[in-house]
């Protein structure tokens, strides 16, 4: 994991943000190694967490001066920092699973010494199936092999 991603995770943890790691990095955490151009951070979309997210991304150095913290509480919000292949995507919605349900099943892991919560294997598969993109369906095929 690159230094910017590590710094972002540290900022999120320091601010006490309620988040779950999803997307390509979550896929990689289950042993299905594939290239990814971003770090997908799924946040709880509520006003209290939005303030924490705002503080974390500001500390990270993201351009938030034109934003209001409550924008991070909007369901369906996407906030991108940087450009691929080193982009951070902060999102408040994914397909196929609700945050409330996913949060109860999220798996605690450590990445480069940083504690993170990763979307559960079952929820990751549900999300990938719901998205329907070719690369996600390829992930599903491999991830389903880890169910056994």
Residue ranges: model-predicted function:
Residues 1-148:
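Compositionally biased terminal segments of proteins
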């Amino acid at each position: 994991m690159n230094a910017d991603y590590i710094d972002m995770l540290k900022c999120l943890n320091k601010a006490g943000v309620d988040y779950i790691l999803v997307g390509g990095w979550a896929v990689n955490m289950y042993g299905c190694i594939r290239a990814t151009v971003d770090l997908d951070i799924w946040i709880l979309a509520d006003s209290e967490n939005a303030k924490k997210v705002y503080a974390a991304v500001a500390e990270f150095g993201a351009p938030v001066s034109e934003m209001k913290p409550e924008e991070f509480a909007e369901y369906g919000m996407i906030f991108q920092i940087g450009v691929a292949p080193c982009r951070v995507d902060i999102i408040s919605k994914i397909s196929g699973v609700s945050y409330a349900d996913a949060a109860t099943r999220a798996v605690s892991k450590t990445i480069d010494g940083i504690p993170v919560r990763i979307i559960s294997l079952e929820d990751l598969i549900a999300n990938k199936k719901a998205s329907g993109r070719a690369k996600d369906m390829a992930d599903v095929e491999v991830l389903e092999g880890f169910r056994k």
